[in-house]
Design a protein with these regions (language model features):
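Glycine-centered tight beta-turn/hairpin loop motif at sheet-sheet or coil-to-beta transitions
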Residues: 72-74
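Short, low-complexity, Pro/Ser/Thr/Gly-rich segments in the mature regions of secreted, periplasmic
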Residues: 95-104
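Short beta-strand
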Residues: 57-59
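A short, surface-exposed beta-strand/turn
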Residues: 77-91
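Conserved histidines in hydrophobic membrane contexts and catalytic metal-binding motifs
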Residues: 67-70, 81
Length: 104
């Protein structure tokens, strides 16, 4: 009986976690206003590619553009950019911050 209760409790816990909405990581917030005023992710990818980046993936996180890719120096990173100005705000490699813009 106790085993059945534990299994039911575990199943309910897993189901509750699975139905939680995706949340921002909290590493960076941009407060960039409505998305209608943002530049596109495609424009950011084009700009980074011209600078020598290899972009694997982009997404919106915390009101910023989050980019997974390789820098021109060959570092595989996660980077955050302001969606209006494309200012680089944070770059981290394997959880270690290697660049953070002043004030962020």
């Amino acid at each position: 009986m106790k085993t059945n209760f534990l299994l039911l409790a575990a199943a309910c816990g897993v189901a509750a976690l699975a139905h939680q909405p995706a949340a921002a990581t909290g590493r960076m917030t941009c407060n960039a206003g409505p998305q209608s005023g943002w530049r596109t992710q495609a424009q950011l990818i084009e700009r980074l590619t011209r600078q020598g980046w290899q972009v694997r993936r982009t997404k919106i996180d915390g009101g910023c553009y989050e980019v997974y890719g390789t820098t021109p120096q060959g570092d595989r990173v996660e980077a955050y950019f302001h969606p209006v100005t494309f200012r680089q705000l944070l770059v981290s490699r394997r959880g270690q911050v290697i660049f953070r813009a002043p004030g962020h």
